[in-house]
Amino acid sequence: MSFEVLEKLEAKIQTAVDTIALLQMEVDELKEDKAKLETEANELRAQREQLEQKAQQTQQEHAQWQERIRALLGKMEDVE
């Protein structure tokens, strides 16, 4: 092989190495982004579960208050 061909081959190899390095950095960034998104998704799931539990608790309390009010109204009707 001539010296020119070797220089061209070296340039192509260097370009490939540079491209691989850039792609690896991009992959690393994407992995970090993915990890952050997974953490955020898990936090949001936990918050949603807490809100669902709170909503259920509030509904139960509401039902209990309605029952108490009905009982009081029934007693008031009995008094009249």
Curated annotation (Swiss-Prot):
GO BP terms in the entry = division septum assembly; FtsZ-dependent cytokinesis
Superkingdom of the source? Bacteria
Q: Where are the transmembrane segments?
A: none
Task: Kindly give the Pfam families that the UniProt entry links to this protein.
Answer: ZapB (PF06005)
Q: Where does this one sit in the cell? A: Cytoplasm
For this UniProt record, the keywords arranged alphabetically read as follows: Cell cycle, Cell division, Coiled coil, Cytoplasm, Septation
Q: What Gene Ontology terms describe where this protein resides (cellular component)?
A: cytoplasm
- Gene3D superfamilies tied to this protein: 1.20.5.340
- Asked whether the UniProt record includes Repressor among its keywords, one would answer no
Q: What is its main location?
A: cytoplasm
Q: Does the keyword Cytoplasm apply?
A: yes
Q: Write out the coiled-coil annotation as residue ranges.
A: 3-80
> Can you state the subunit structure given in the record?
Homodimer. The ends of the coiled-coil dimer bind to each other, forming polymers. Interacts with FtsZ.
In which family does this protein belong, per the annotation? Belongs to the ZapB family.
| Function statement | Non-essential, abundant cell division factor that is required for proper Z-ring formation. It is recruited early to the divisome by direct interaction with FtsZ, stimulating Z-ring assembly and thereby promoting cell division earlier in the cell cycle. Its recruitment to the Z-ring requires functional FtsA or ZipA.
What protein is this chain from? Cell division protein ZapB
**Species per Swiss-Prot/TrEMBL record:** Vibrio vulnificus (strain YJ016)
